[in-house]
Swiss-Prot record:
Ranges for region Interaction with NBN: 87-117
Record text on subunit structure and interactions: Component of the MRN complex composed of two heterodimers RAD50 and MRE11 associated with a single NBN. The MRN complexes dimerize on DNA to form joined MRN-MRN oligomers required for DNA double-strand break repair. As part of the MRN complex, interacts with MCM9; the interaction recruits the complex to DNA repair sites. Component of the BASC complex, at least composed of BRCA1, MSH2, MSH6, MLH1, ATM, BLM, RAD50, MRE11 and NBN. Found in a complex with TERF2. Interacts with DCLRE1C/Artemis and DCLRE1B/Apollo. Interacts with ATF2. Interacts with EXD2. Interacts with MRNIP.
Basic residues composition bias: residue spans: 569-579
Modification N6-lactoyllysine, positions: K671
Regulation: Interaction with SAMHD1 stimulates the double-strand-specific 3'-5' exonuclease activity. RBBP8/CtIP specifically promotes the endonuclease activity to clear protein-DNA adducts and generate clean double-strand break ends. DYNLL1-binding inhibits the activity of MRE11. MRE11 activity is inhibited by C1QBP: in absence of DNA damage, C1QBP interacts with unphosphorylated MRE11, preventing formation and activity of the MRN complex.
Protein name listed in UniProt: Double-strand break repair protein MRE11
GO CC field: BRCA1-C complex; chromatin; chromosome, telomeric region; condensed nuclear chromosome; cytoplasm; Mre11 complex; nucleoplasm; nucleus
Segments of skewed composition (Basic and acidic residues): 505-514
Residues in cross-link Glycyl lysine isopeptide (Lys-Gly) (interchain with G-Cter in SUMO): K384, K468
Start-end of Acidic residues biased regions: 643-653, 684-694
EC top class, as a word: hydrolase
Similarity comment: family membership: Belongs to the MRE11/RAD32 family.
Amino acid sequence: MSPTDPLDDEDTFKILVATDIHLGFMEKDAVRGNDTFVTFDEILRLALENEVDFILLGGDLFHENKPSRKTLHSCLELLRKYCMGDRPVQFEIISDQSVNFGFSKFPWVNYRDGNLNISIPVFSIHGNHDDPTGADALCALDVLSCAGFVNHFGRSMSVEKVDISPVLLQKGSTKLALYGLGSIPDERLYRMFVNKKVTMLRPKEDENSWFNLFVIHQNRSKHGSTNFIPEQFLDDFIDLVIWGHEHECKIGPTRNEQQLFYVSQPGSSVVTALSPGETVKKHVGLLRVKGRKMNMQKLPLRTVRQFFMEDVVLANHPSLFNPDNPKVTQAIQSFCLEKIEEMLDSAERERLGNPQQPEKPLIRLRVDYSGGFEPFNVLRFSQKFVDRVANPKDVIHFFRHREQKGKTGEEINFGKLIIKPASEGTTLRVEDLVKQYFQTAEKNVQLSLLTERGMGEAVQEFVDKEEKDAIEELVKYQLEKTQRFLKERHIDALEDKIDEEVRRFRESRQRNTNEEDDEVREAMSRARALRSQSENAASAFSADDLSFDITEQTADDSDDSQSAVPSRGRGRGRGRRGGRGQSTAPRGGSQRGRDTGLGISTRGRSSKATASTSRNMSIIDAFRSTRQQPSRNVATKNYSETIEVDESDDDDSFPTSSRADQRWSGTAPSKRMSQSQTAKGVDFESDEDDDDDPFMSGSCPRRNRR
């Protein structure tokens, strides 16, 4: 369909769907720094050219939890450029906006704000990269929401129970129920689904007349026993699921035969990991919804940097490489050079006729050197391609896989055998490393009071969210809780008995996962509150508080400049913003200037010594210490619908058949037809070959639901 197709009438929703844009990814890289912004510009331009009703984002709009000023500025600039204007919004919102956007200071959709002139509304959930953090649980999307550019929905305020209330939209006779669930740690959400703590609310009136669209940002592929969300967990009244977080582009809706809904995985719009899933061509989707029918048109992204990957197993070429040959390294280098040149030639051929595509491609050659071979110097080899590829430092990746006990003669499956580094998008997580360490550590270094899970969560907060006080607050909180337990039990002050009671108390907490979750949340909230207090205290200093003798400062700078070379190329004498004689710590760190005479320091030597002493106290010492800190406290579907997948930009239209014609034919043999099942009536039209299209089958049974 073209943007001016007559079937795009007042009853048809046109929605641009995208996920995982990752604005700011590698923004400091000289070659790839602007890739995310250029592609985001293309996505918004596609929305404008296709005259969509709104844009739907599936999380991870930003790559960093705390995006830089450049990233925020570029994002706001593009949203203002494309999403503001005089074009009227053709649909209305009929749900309670105070429920949909209740966590915002402006609990209404942005295009209904009289102070804003929005032409293309943007609805977005948050992902795991830009999720809410801090004492106030804010994220970068909340900044965009407050500015009036994004409608942030799908946010859960509770960690015990999730009630998903839909945003109800109507355009003409078409009713769209938009459900969203921002990123939640997979293990926690998995447990909530198992315990029936996730509820998707439905409209009270005429619930079967709504097209139900659900946006989620979780692991779809299985990374562990509970580190993913099975599609079977989702309610079966859903019609289409937009699945974010997974970067491989599988935007064509696929049918879940158990729940009988469709899943579309748009994938990322930028290559963030040099892994096989990222080699798939990137697309966004133009979703049309009319009544109970839908059509998904794939729109290729033409500004995405090319990415080519190839695997080489040296042992598979015995005629070319002999490990005992002293010149085998030179032969391997020549072979790798030839492979990379082939990929560069392929990139050049594909780039012809597309001036929007970046000139330098991403190239990755993975070399398995098992069998007695030795890797060569990758950095020296990569210097040949500095001016030709966008990733010269990691063009080649050497690896070895462990020898298998039994040879099956099958081809090597790199996805199963390769131990990928973190740079290739593996799911290596901090809390898993902590758990693995304590599982393999010797007995004398095992935790006796703290829990592995709590420590893992605290370290993850420290690494991912830069919560510098997370570990310290967790230790203090669990120590306080243990002390209270021992006091309540009136344990004798015998070291052996106290150690035994502490061990039992720790084991009981480990068995009670809910209690341990509460401990971690309380400790993290205390760490965030402490950081917020430190930030407020740092920002409370005025120019009068930090004033000093300009003459002394100038003399001091003059002396320093004669005796030492500055280590940073920053200007001197910055006034109230701080020169070399000042140092401000925005997060509560040390604020000691050099020769300023202010004596402002939040953590002097004495405090460090005290902290070190308290950390080294044993359990018995802590218990005996007299100084105590205060404690801190489903309906049956009887409708039919039509779903189409458009693989090209050619004109196509919604089927004009009657309601009876939209139902599946019952002539094709099927084992399930004898079970009195009714068809959901989902039909696909595609430009691909019918033999390869799983949606063009003559019959698709549907069972009756209770």
